Amino acid sequence: MKCPYCGHLDNKVIDSRINKDATITRRRRSCLACDQRFTTYERLEVMFPMLVKKDGRREAWDRHKLVVGIEKACEKRAVSRDKIDEFVDDIEHMLQDYGAKEISSSIVGEWVMERLPALDEVAYVRFASVYRQFKDVDEFMSELKNLLDARGGGDD
């Protein structure tokens, strides 16, 4: 592993830790040339199905896109980055379990919509407003009513 400080290739691992679900190894390394320490992460490369967009285009799965979308929905909410990472990990596990080479992006979107209220209800409403592309206030209110009904808080 190349040292990010001096570019030297020789270093030693001084600590290794595996995350809770044994999918990522974090290693602390020390450069043998400059003695600087740095951290590397190893993650198993998993092949995810290709996403088929509404217009028929095919696109490779991009974890970062979902993370950014969830972060935007959770902006100024008490949702930690760890919780967001766990949420996206769960979606990725579902993609792995799907068992096909392609999946409609709308299926993935629905998975996100089904699980987001458990993470944060306000984030759900924010995400839904973009994902569902509400045309008017009535559609937005209908989605809010569905959320309230799902948690047993509807007034009807």
Swiss-Prot record:
Q: Which domain of life is it from?
A: Bacteria
User: Which InterPro entries does the record match to this protein?
Assistant: ATP-cone_dom, NrdR-like_N, RNR_NrdR-like
**Ranges annotated as unnamed zinc finger:** 3-34
By what name is this protein known? Transcriptional repressor NrdR
Q: What does this protein do?
A: Negatively regulates transcription of bacterial ribonucleotide reductase nrd genes and operons by binding to NrdR-boxes.
Give any single GO term for biological process.
negative regulation of DNA-templated transcription
Instruction: Report the cofactors.
Output: Zn(2+)
Q: How is the cofactor bound?
A: Binds 1 zinc ion.
For whether the record's keyword set contains Plastid, the answer is no
Q: Which PROSITE patterns match?
A: ATP_CONE
Q: What is stated as this protein's family in its record?
A: Belongs to the NrdR family.
UniProt entry tagged with the keyword Cytoplasm: no
Coiled-coil regions listed in the entry: none
Gene label: nrdR
GO MF annotations in UniProt? ATP binding; DNA binding; zinc ion binding
List keywords of the entry alphabetically: ATP-binding, DNA-binding, Metal-binding, Nucleotide-binding, Repressor, Transcription, Transcription regulation, Zinc, Zinc-finger
